[in-house]
C-alpha cells in the first residue's frame, strides 16, 4: 500500500520535466504595436503578437501587462500573428506588455517587453514622404490675381475721388455765376437811381443866391439883363451823391444853363 504514493510522485516529476523540456523547444514570439508607442488619450491601439511559423497546433495566445494576464484569445489555424485591440485608452493603459502562447498544456517563453505610454496631447505623426508636386505655377497665378485686383481697386478709388471733386466744384461754381450775373444788374440799378436822385439833390444843394434868383419874378416894364452861365453837372452830382460809377458819370455828362436876372 505504501508504494502507490511513491509511484505517483515519480510520475508527476517525470511529467513536469517533460513539460519543461517541451516549453523550451517552442518557437520564439515577437510583439509590436501597429502605431507609435506614444498613444493619445481616448484613441485606440492594436498590439500584434507574431510567430516564427504557422501555429496550426497552437490553441491559445495571451497578452500580459507587467507579468499579469491582460487579454487572451484562441488562435486561428494557419496564421502567423494575432492582434489585440485596446481602447479607448487612458492613463491606466501605460505599462510593459508581452505575448505568450500555448500548445496543448505547454506555454512558450514570453516575448520581449513592449512599453506603451498614454499622453493627454494629440500626437502629430509625420506622414510618409510621397511624390512632391510642383506648386510654383499656383504661386505665380495667385500673385497675378492679387495684382489685377489691386489695380482695379485703385482705378475705382480714383474714379470716385474724381467724381467727388467734380461735384464739389459744380456746387461752388453756381453761387459765383449767380453773383456775376447779379453784379451788372446792380450796377445798372445804381446808375439809374443816381440819375433819378441827382435833380433833387442838386436843387437842394444850390447856393442861396441861386435859390433867390429862381424865386424872384421880374416886374413888367423893368429892364432885364440876362446872363447865362454854364454849370458842371458832374461836379455837382459827385458832391451830392459821393461815389458814382464811371458809367453813370459818362452818361450824365452834359451842360446845364441857368438864367440870372440882374436889375
Swiss-Prot record:
GO terms for cellular component: plasma membrane. It is found in: Cell membrane. Disulfide bonds join 49-99. It is a single-pass type I membrane protein. Glycans are attached at residues 34, 90. The chain crosses the membrane at residues 145-165. Residues 1-21 form the signal peptide. GO terms for biological process: cell surface receptor signaling pathway. A motif (ITIM motif 2) lies at residues 255-260. It comes from the Eukaryota. Functions as an inhibitory receptor that plays a constitutive negative regulatory role on cytolytic function of natural killer (NK) cells, B-cells and T-cells. Activation by Tyr phosphorylation results in recruitment and activation of the phosphatases PTPN6 and PTPN11. It also reduces the increase of intracellular calcium evoked by B-cell receptor ligation. May also play its inhibitory role independently of SH2-containing phosphatases. Modulates cytokine production in CD4+ T-cells, down-regulating IL2 and IFNG production while inducing secretion of transforming growth factor beta. This is Leukocyte-associated immunoglobulin-like receptor 1. The gene is Lair1.
Amino acid at each position: 500500500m505504501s508504494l502507490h504514493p511513491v509511484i505517483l510522485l515519480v510520475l508527476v516529476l517525470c511529467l513536469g520535466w517533460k513539460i519543461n523540456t517541451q516549453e523550451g523547444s517552442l518557437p520564439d514570439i515577437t510583439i509590436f504595436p501597429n502605431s507609435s508607442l506614444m498613444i493619445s488619450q481616448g484613441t485606440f491601439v492594436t498590439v500584434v503578437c507574431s510567430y516564427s511559423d504557422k501555429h496550426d497546433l497552437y490553441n491559445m495566445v495571451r497578452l500580459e501587462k507587467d507579468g499579469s494576464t491582460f487579454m487572451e484569445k484562441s488562435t486561428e489555424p494557419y496564421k502567423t500573428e494575432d492582434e489585440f485591440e485596446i481602447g479607448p485608452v487612458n492613463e491606466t493603459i501605460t505599462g510593459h506588455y508581452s505575448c505568450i502562447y500555448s500548445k496543448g498544456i505547454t506555454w512558450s517563453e514570453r516575448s520581449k517587453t513592449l512599453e506603451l505610454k498614454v499622453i493627454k496631447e494629440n500626437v502629430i505623426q509625420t506622414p510618409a514622404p510621397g511624390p512632391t508636386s510642383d506648386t510654383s505655377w499656383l504661386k505665380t497665378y495667385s500673385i497675378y490675381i492679387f495684382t489685377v485686383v489691386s489695380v482695379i481697386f485703385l482705378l475705382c478709388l480714383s474714379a470716385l475721388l474724381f467724381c467727388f471733386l467734380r461735384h464739389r466744384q459744380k456746387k461752388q461754381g453756381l453761387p459765383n455765376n449767380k453773383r456775376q450775373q447779379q453784379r451788372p444788374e446792380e450796377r445798372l440799378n445804381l446808375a439809374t437811381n443816381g440819375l433819378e436822385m441827382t435833380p433833387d439833390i442838386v436843387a437842394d444843394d444850390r447856393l442861396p443866391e441861386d435859390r433867390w434868383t429862381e424865386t424872384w419874378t421880374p416886374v413888367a416894364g423893368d429892364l432885364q439883363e440876362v446872363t447865362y452861365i454854364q454849370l458842371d453837372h458832374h461836379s455837382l452830382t459827385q458832391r451830392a451823391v459821393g461815389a458814382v460809377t464811371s458809367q453813370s458819370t459818362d452818361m450824365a455828362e452834359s451842360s446845364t444853363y441857368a438864367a440870372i436876372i440882374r436889375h
